[in-house]
Amino acid sequence: SVINTQIKPFKTQAFKNGKFIEVTE
């Protein structure tokens, strides 16, 4: 999970929100 966070921090942020939303801006 730590590695995934380093690769896609924005994606993890959305997941932490409680919703699985891919925020790729």
Swiss-Prot record:
<keyword id="KW-0049">Antioxidant</keyword>
<keyword id="KW-0575">Peroxidase</keyword>
<keyword id="KW-0963">Cytoplasm</keyword>
<comment type="similarity">
    <text>Belongs to the peroxiredoxin family. AhpC/Prx1 subfamily.</text>
</comment>
<dbReference type="GO" id="GO:0005737">
    <property type="term" value="C:cytoplasm"/>
</dbReference>
<dbReference type="GO" id="GO:0102039">
    <property type="term" value="F:NADH-dependent peroxiredoxin activity"/>
</dbReference>
<keyword id="KW-0560">Oxidoreductase</keyword>
<keyword id="KW-1015">Disulfide bond</keyword>
<comment type="subunit">
    <text>Homodimer; disulfide-linked, upon oxidation. 5 homodimers assemble to form a ring-like decamer.</text>
</comment>
<protein>
    <recommendedName>
        <fullName>Alkyl hydroperoxide reductase C</fullName>
        <ecNumber>1.11.1.26</ecNumber>
    </recommendedName>
</protein>
<comment type="function">
    <text>Thiol-specific peroxidase that catalyzes the reduction of hydrogen peroxide and organic hydroperoxides to water and alcohols, respectively. Plays a role in cell protection against oxidative stress by detoxifying peroxides.</text>
</comment>
<keyword id="KW-0676">Redox-active center</keyword>
